[in-house]
Amino acid sequence: MQLRAFISVFASLACVNAAVIDHDQVVPFAQPTPTTTLQTLAVQYKPQIYIANGCHPYPAVDEDGNTSGGLKPTGSQSAGCKGSGYGSQIYGRAVAYEGVYAFMYSWYMPKDETLPGLGHRHDWEACVVWLDSLENPNVVALSASYHSTYLTYYPPDSDYLDGNSAKIEYSTSWVILDHLLSATSTSGETQDLIMWDQLTDAARTALEDTDFGDANVPFKDANFETKLANAYYT
């Protein structure tokens, strides 16, 4: 059996043994040492997130492919999801796109609740930091997920950046009755970054295959290109 086929079979078997577990029992990946230029820049340009209301970010998957069961939208917006004792996670994926470089960062929240009982289990949000080069990079634009589309900031206001780190806010939109991301001048917190190509095979397979209901994983293979097209700033 060829190595690639063996790895694929092994990942599939691992996923069979994976489970949906309580949202506060998912152990995040530690941020690994970068080994590529894209990974290095992804760490250098990692954004921060300010939670205006709602859940704080949680890890969605562990190294064995176990995924978060999320939370029902009950109680207050942040009931049961004010932070994991194991620590949180930010996910990333980077690619050359339309002559620039797209660095997508994504957070998972166990629920998206605008009012008590109104909302849905699971929430995935993403922002894209657009760099003009890999050698002497500058942030040329920011994009922040707004339901199924993106708010774009081209060029971004200097108040939206803390050095290389974009400042992103997670808050409620009373127009679409969902949470969204937007650029902000308010500083936030950072989480350990794990890139798509740094995940275990079991974790990648779980993110590809798990049904997160009304939320979808923006950086998985099935969604990544479409999300980037929606987020592109011109």
Swiss-Prot record:
Glycan attachment residues as annotated in the record: N66
Swiss-Prot/TrEMBL induction comment: Expression reached the highest levels at 3 days after inoculation of pepper leaves, followed by a gradual decline.
Annotated signal sequence range: 1-18
Keywords recorded for this protein, A-Z: Glycoprotein, Secreted, Signal, Virulence
Motif (Conserved undecapeptide motif I): 102-112
Classification via InterPro entries: NPP1 (IPR008701)
Chain span(s) of sequence motif Hepta-peptide GHRHDWE motif II: 119-125
Chief location category: secreted
Gene Ontology CC annotation, any one: extracellular region
Cellular compartment(s): Secreted
Domains: entry comment: Key residues/motif important for the effector activities are degenerated in most NLPs, including the nlp24 peptide consisting of the conserved region I (11-aa immunogenic part) and conserved region II (the heptapeptide GHRHDWE motif) that is important for phytotoxic activity.
PANTHER family from the UniProt entry: DOMAIN PROTEIN, PUTATIVE (AFU_ORTHOLOGUE AFUA_5G00600)-RELATED
Functional summary from the UniProt entry: Secreted effector that contributes to virulence during infection by P.capsici. Induces distinct chlorosis at 3 days after inoculation of host C.annuum leaves, and all the chlorotic areas gradually turn brown and become moderately necrotic at 7 days after inoculation. Leads only to chlorotic areas, without necrosis at 7 days after non-host N.benthamiana leaves infection. Induces cell death in hot pepper.
Protein family: Belongs to the Necrosis inducing protein (NPP1) family.
Name recorded for this polypeptide: NLP effector protein 1
Source organism of this protein record: Phytophthora capsici
